[in-house]
Amino acid sequence: MKFSRSVGFVLLLLSVGVAPACSQGEPPATQVSSAVPADLQTGEAKFKANCSACHGVAGIGTSHGPPLVHKIYEPNHHGDAAFQRAAANGVKAHHWEFGNMPKIEGVTPDDVDQIIKYVRWLQHEAGVF
C-alpha cells in the first residue's frame, strides 16, 4: 500500500511537471485578443449583425456554422470573391456538416468587402495566414 502511494505521488509530480512543458509551443487559440483597429470596426459591426449568429463572435464558429478563422478560409483557398458569392447566392455545404448557407438579404457588396477585411484581420491575428 505504501509503495503504490509513493508511486502514485511520483507519477502525480511528473505529470504536473510535464504538462506545462507539453503545452509550450502549441498554437494559440483561434480567438483574437487584440483590439479591433478603428478602420475595421464597421466591418466588425456588420459581421456581428449579419454573420455572427452562425459563424460565432470573432468568427470562431457555432453549432450552426463553421469557423471562418480557420485554415480552410485562408485567402489562398477561399478568396474574397468566394465570400462575395456566398453572401449574394448562398453556398451549398461542402466542407462542413452544418447544412447549406442561405444568401444574406440586405447586405451590399460594399458591406461584404468591409466584413471580409475584418475576417481577414481576425484570421491574420490568429495565425491562419
Regions found by a protein language model. Name each.
Residues 1-38, 86, 118-129:
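Post-cleavage N-terminal segment of exported redox proteins
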Residues 43, 48-57, 115-119:
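The canonical Cys-X-X-Cys-His
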